Amino acid sequence: HEMGHQFDAEHTFNSDNGGCSGNRSSNTAYEPGSGSTIMSYAGLCSPNSYAGYASGRFYHVKSFEQIVTYTTAGSGNSCPTITPTGNQPPIVDAGAGGFSIPISTPFTLPGSATEADGDSLIYSWEQYDLGNAGDWDSPSGDAPIFRVFPPVGEPTRTFPQISDVVN
């Protein structure tokens, strides 16, 4: 977490309760409640915390964007030695355009990717919406409501989790 700050990554949680009070970064608050990634305050924003969950060992895509900007265009780019890896980025297809669904309707997002070097791929589906600070259990339609999970090998994700839908 503190290393992320050294690379210009800000907090990504959206709660302003408990230990999160006064620490929310409104321009990077993409995670509901206390958040669940490295730059979150997982478990510290009572009552909006993920119970028993420590910060994941992965960054939210917004943190990744900030770190890449710092190391390629910011002051973190003042003295690098660039070493080409030869690795090709994957070609990703998460669908074109958008779609509408009725409110409170579970949905599944499919995706696919190919990688020219034959590397195995993992997938992370992340909500990328900023909004007002607030509680995840009383959504107002203008803030993130879906938490980030660690990347997996399956190229689909159901929102909310299927276990939450059937319970």
Model region roles, listed by residue range:
Residues 2-167:
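Extracellular (secreted or membrane-anchored) zinc-dependent metallopeptidases
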